[in-house]
Amino acid sequence: MADVKKVATRVSYGGALVELGNERDDFVVLDADLAAATQTGKFKAAHPERFYDAGIAESNLMGLAAGIATTGRVAFASTFAMFAAGRAYEQVRNSIGYPHLNVKIGATHAGISVGEDGATHQCCEDIALMRTIPGMTVIVPADDIEARACVRAAYEFEGPVYMRFGRLATPVINDREDYEFKIGRGVVVREGSGVTIVACGLMVAEALEAAEALAADGIDAEVINMHTIKPLDERLVVASAKKTGRVVTAEEHSIIGGLGEAVASVLAEQHPVPMRRVGVRDVYGESGPAVDLLHKYGLDADGIEAAVRSVL
C-alpha cells in the first residue's frame, strides 16, 4: 500500500473536533499538557473558550471532565493512552463510568507504534482495562475516515466512550461512497470463504495486505474491520465463522484482554472453530522505529499471513 494516502488517526481526531466544534457549541475539549501531540491544539486555536488544559495531571483531567459532564455538556478528555487508561484508571472507572457520564476519552499514541518513546509509553493494555468498565464503549478506528466518523458518533452517543488513536500515519482504506460507521457494527471489507481475519486499528490495512498475499496461493480470506471492541458485533463474528470455519484476530494490543479474547469468548460460547490471535504476546515493548517494531512483534501482514497458514 505504498501509494495509498496515509494519515495518523490522532491527526484525524484533532481535525474532527474542530469540524464538530464549528457546528455545535455544547461540548468542550480537555487535555493534559499534550495538545500538540494529541492534536487538540487545533480545537484550542479555533475555540479557545471551550478548551481546558489540566496540566500534567491526568487523574484531575478525568475528574474535571466528569464534573463538566454533570452540567449537561459533552466533554472530550484527551491524553496519551498510557495515561488515559493507566494513570487515570480509577477516575475513569469511578468518576466517569460509575455514573455513566457523557465523557468521550480521546486516547492517542496507543500501542507499539508509539515507537522511540519506548515501553513506558507503549500502552498495549488499554483495551483490556477499558473493556472491563461496565457501560464503557471502546472504539479503535482503522483510518482517517473512520476516526473522524467515530468522533462524531461518540459525540452523539449517550454514555462514556473510549476512542483509541495512533501516532503512526496509516493507509486510508475506507474511501468509498457506501462507507457507513455505526457503533457496535463491524464491517466486512473483503469477502471470503476460507478463513476469517478480524482486525482493528492499523491492523485492518495489514489484514487486507495479508489477504492479497494469501489469495495468490488460493486461500480466500474474509476480512472484518471490527472498529468497535465493546459492544462487539457478535452476530457478524459468528456468521463469518460459520461461513469460513477458521478465525484469526489481529490487533496492536496485548493478546490478553483485547479484540482476540473478545472474539474468542463469543466463539467459545456460540460457535467454536480453530482460531489464532495476532497481537503483543505478554511482553513489554521497546524503543525503535514504529514500522520495525511492528514487524518484530509480528504486527504486520507477514505476521497475519503466518497465523492464517497455521490455522488452515
Regions found by a protein language model. Give the residues of each.
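Thiamine diphosphate
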Residues: 1-164, 169, 180, ...
